[in-house]
């Protein structure tokens, strides 16, 4: 009996592996900083309910640019929720507390909910429980004017992956989405 089960599994193994590989090729993108920003804009444009941006560090230029995107403006005017999770504006959490505090104020002034969380380095964007970006790019800090850093984001279209990551690594996720800016 065990040998039969093992034999059937080995026969199916390569087929399942190929299916998994094809699925992930279709549902996954590897994005450099410029590609990430373009993909994020497209996703915000199609936003149904919310976008959660987890960016430990903030840059004034990047935050202002984000707040002034037509896609962000449209989403907010339509009552969709944009939530940013970042570190508190104090040393040792951030290098420049003054700039960081200014960034959080700019976000709030635009109607974006800001949540401060200490001591985290995770970077991600979650859209409508179905799209997740994870990687090394701080979404609201990255600046690509002088050079493109060797950072990346992986974009997955997978409700199951969003569930898995939020349950295992972001237990506060549902609380962050409650309430308004």
Say what each PLM segment does.
Residues 1-17, 132-181:
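Signature of lipid phosphatidyltransferase scaffolds
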Residues 112-117:
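General small-molecule cofactor/ligand-binding pocket signal
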Residues 123-126:
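Short beta-strand scaffold segments in enzyme catalytic cores
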Residues 120:
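Conserved catalytic or regulatory cores that recognize and/or transform ribose-phosphate-containing ligands
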Residues 36, 40-109:
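Primarily the HKD phosphodiesterase
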Residues 14-34, 49-60:
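Acidic/glycine-enriched edge-of-secondary-structure segments
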């Amino acid at each position: 009996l065990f040998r039969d089960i093992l034999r059937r599994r080995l026969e199916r193994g390569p087929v399942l592996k190929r299916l998994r590989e094809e699925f992930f090729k279709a549902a996954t993108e590897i994005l450099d900083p410029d590609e990430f920003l373009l993909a994020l804009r497209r996703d915000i444009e199609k936003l149904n309910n919310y976008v959660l941006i987890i960016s430990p560090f903030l840059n004034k230029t990047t935050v202002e640019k984000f707040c002034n995107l037509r896609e962000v403006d449209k989403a907010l005017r339509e009552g969709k929720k944009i939530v940013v999770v970042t570190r508190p504006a104090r040393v040792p959490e951030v290098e420049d507390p003054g700039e960081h505090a200014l960034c959080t104020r700019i976000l709030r002034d635009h109607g974006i909910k800001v949540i401060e969380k200490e001591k985290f380095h995770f970077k991600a964007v979650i859209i409508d429980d179905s799209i997740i970006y994870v990687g090394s790019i701080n979404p609201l800090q990255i600046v690509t004017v002088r050079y493109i850093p060797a950072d990346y984001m992986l974009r997955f279209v997978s409700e199951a992956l969003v569930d898995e990551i939020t349950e295992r690594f972001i237990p506060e996720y549902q609380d962050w989405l409650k309430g308004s800016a």
